Amino acid sequence: MASLKDVARLAGVSMMTVSRVMHNAESVRPATRDRVLQAIQTLNYVPDLSARKMRAQGRKPSTLAVLAQDTATTPFSVDILLAIEQTASEFGWNSFLINIFSEDDAARAARQLLAHRPDGIIYTTMGLRHITLPESLYGENIVLANCVADDPALPSYIPDDYTAQYESTQHLLAAGYRQPLCFWLPESALATGYRRQGFEQAWRDAGRDLAEVKQFHMATGDDHYTDLASLLNAHFKSGKPDFDVLICGNDRAAFVAYQVLLAKGVRIPQDVAVMGFDNLVGVGHLFLPPLTTIQLPHDIIGREAALHIIEGREGGRVTRIPCPLLIRCST
């Protein structure tokens, strides 16, 4: 990583002049300022804000930095952040968070984060995603939480969506359900492939024919949850459902399904069973009857990612965290 001295050398000025430019001192000549700014850009120099804190405090506590892509600004994965903060505090580490507001914003957020010279970095996302890691973060002490990247050297902690859907399908088969209607998440969602593969493998392993399964993918975007109502209505013949269990891509889809089924006088689970996925915080038990669903282990993902940094774990690999099946009253 480039230093203040490197910038001064490339610009042909003193370190004091570089410092004055960075603090927007008016006494620096425009031509000199331009050379310094060009050198900063060429070297991708990031000022060491932690050094200022060290000089002020006399010591440097261990610090864990979190890059949050939609994790802090939506309610669906906030347990990841809470677990990271709690784990860091438990082991005497400081932690701070910087939001990433879009894919294009990641480089800016990374520069801002590196200015604080953290001892470790956790990159988090809302929903399992494939990310492109900003170049400035390569070589840093970093771990991924709820996301993966191309580089196999990057350790990551993600939900075991495949096994979760496999085991939940076994539960449905054991309960006697044979006519599933599946509303999966959009095909573009990384978790969708794992979940559908898990379902289909369990179905085949039970000696069943996939041709008897009705499978659909939701469109991308929250606006399309209402589309599920018309899709569901299309599977009623003479007022009767042509399926005996509805497998939903998440609990929000299950919520829409409940409204349609109950409005038609369909009893859950006596006439049709419903299975969700996510165990959306504070919602599962509010379904009537309570929804059988699968827990996304966001709290464990956050804790394991933090411990990876704190304990100095070595090796880059994908660690899949089990997703427990929560059997309630809808199956």
UniProtKB/Swiss-Prot annotation:
GO molecular-function terms, A-Z: DNA-binding transcription factor activity; transcription cis-regulatory region binding
Superkingdom field: Bacteria
Residues in coiled coil: none
Pfam families: LacI, Peripla_BP_1
Residues in HTH lacI-type domain copies: 1-56
UniProt xrefs under InterPro entries: HTH_LacI, Lambda_DNA-bd_dom_sf, Peripla_BP/Lac1_sug-bd_dom, Peripla_BP_I
DNA-binding region: 4-23
Key word DNA-binding present: yes
The keyword Transcription regulation is assigned to this record: yes
Keywords, comma-separated and alphabetical: DNA-binding, Repressor, Transcription, Transcription regulation
Record PANTHER family: HTH-TYPE TRANSCRIPTIONAL REPRESSOR CYTR, LACI-RELATED TRANSCRIPTIONAL REPRESSOR
Function recorded in the entry: Repressor for the csc operon. Binds D-fructose as an inducer.
Name recorded for this polypeptide: Sucrose operon repressor
Organism phylogeny: Bacteria, Pseudomonadati, Pseudomonadota, Gammaproteobacteria, Enterobacterales
Gene that this polypeptide is encoded by: cscR
